[in-house]
Amino acid sequence: EHLVEYCKDNGIQVVAYSSFGPQSYIELNHPLAKNTPNLFHHDTIKQIANNHNVATSQVLLRWATQRGIAIIPKSSKKERLQDNLMIDEKLTLTHKELEAISKLNKNLRLNDPWDWLDGKFPIFA
């Protein structure tokens, strides 16, 4: 959260990578990913999705965009791509919902090269 605020204060656009959590890293046998709960099945995310009659993925994407964070979700399904493009028009989360999702923060960083290259290539941002 501190990095996001710093970037906003300094006119730097933050781009979310792996908006849905560890899914992409599980197949790579990343130990942190294996032990990280799937956000699609988290009770808080499911409840908010049910309240708005949307998919859990849409809740996660909107949480980012509503906070001014750019997203780059991928999908092989045309319908999902269309849903992702329309998320800002389709869903607005309440302040309480934004806070509830933000409280799920575990300060994980799955895409840190430091973890993959035995400390030879640190990333500082």
Segments the model singles out, each with a brief description of its role:
Residues 1-125:
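Beta/alpha (TIM)-barrel catalytic core signal, keyed to glycine-rich beta->alpha loops juxtaposed to Asp/Glu
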